[in-house]
Amino acid sequence: MRIGIGIDVHPFAEGRKLVIGGVHIPGHNGLDGHSDADVLLHAVSDALLGAAALGDIGLHFPNTSQEFKDIDSMILLKQVRKLLEKHGYQTVNIDAMLLLEEPKIAPYITGMRKNIARCLDIEIGMVSVKATTNEKLGYIGREEGAAAHAVCIIRSL
C-alpha cells in the first residue's frame, strides 16, 4: 500500500464555466487555468501520481502545451489511471476535501464521486468528497478562488 496527497488551487474568472469533479455547476464564475481548471480532479490526480512516485500533474500535462488547453480534466484523470496501471498500481481509496465559500457543493457531491469512480474504474464507495468553507478568511473566504486537497491509497496489482 502507498499513500499520496494532492493539493490544487485556482482563482475564479469571469466568462469561464465552473466544473468541479467533472460536474458543471451553473450560476457561478468558473475557475481559471490552462485546462478546465477542475481543482478537485487536479488534486486527486496529484495524489495518485505522488503515491506512485510518478511526479505530478504538471509533469505529465504541462500548462505550456496546447494539447492540454481547456481539456476536460476527466480525460487527464483517466490518463493518470492508465499510467498507474502501466506501473502496476490500482486505486484503493480517495478522500478529498473542497474549500470554497460559494457555491454550495452538497447537491453535486454524488455526481463528483461517480465521475471520479468512473475515471478510476473503482466503486463509488471508494471515493469520498467533502466540502467546507474557509469561514470568510483569506482568498477563499473573499471568494477569489477555490482549493482542493486529496489523499489516496494505492496498491500493487
Swiss-Prot record:
This is 2-C-methyl-D-erythritol 2,4-cyclodiphosphate synthase. GO terms for molecular function: 2-C-methyl-D-erythritol 2,4-cyclodiphosphate synthase activity; metal ion binding. It is an enzyme of class 4 (lyase). SUPFAM superfamilies: IpsF-like (SSF69765). Pathway: Isoprenoid biosynthesis; isopentenyl diphosphate biosynthesis via DXP pathway; isopentenyl diphosphate from 1-deoxy-D-xylulose 5-phosphate: step 4/6. InterPro entries: MECDP_synthase, MECDP_synthase_CS, MECDP_synthase_sf. Involved in the biosynthesis of isopentenyl diphosphate (IPP) and dimethylallyl diphosphate (DMAPP), two major building blocks of isoprenoid compounds. Catalyzes the conversion of 4-diphosphocytidyl-2-C-methyl-D-erythritol 2-phosphate (CDP-ME2P) to 2-C-methyl-D-erythritol 2,4-cyclodiphosphate (ME-CPP) with a corresponding release of cytidine 5-monophosphate (CMP). Homotrimer. Gene3D superfamilies: 2-C-methyl-D-erythritol 2,4-cyclodiphosphate synthase. The record marks H34, T133 as: Transition state stabilizer. Binds 1 divalent metal cation per subunit. Belongs to the IspF family. Its EC number is 4.6.1.12. Keywords: Isoprene biosynthesis, Lyase, Metal-binding. Transmembrane segments: none annotated. 4-CDP-2-C-methyl-D-erythritol 2-phosphate binds at D8, V9, H10, H34, S35, D56, I57, G58, T132, T133, N134, E135, R142. GO terms for biological process: isopentenyl diphosphate biosynthetic process, methylerythritol 4-phosphate pathway; terpenoid biosynthetic process. It comes from Pelodictyon phaeoclathratiforme (strain DSM 5477 / BU-1). Pfam families: YgbB. Its cofactor is a divalent metal cation. It catalyses: 4-CDP-2-C-methyl-D-erythritol 2-phosphate = 2-C-methyl-D-erythritol 2,4-cyclic diphosphate + CMP. A divalent metal cation binds at D8, H10, H42.
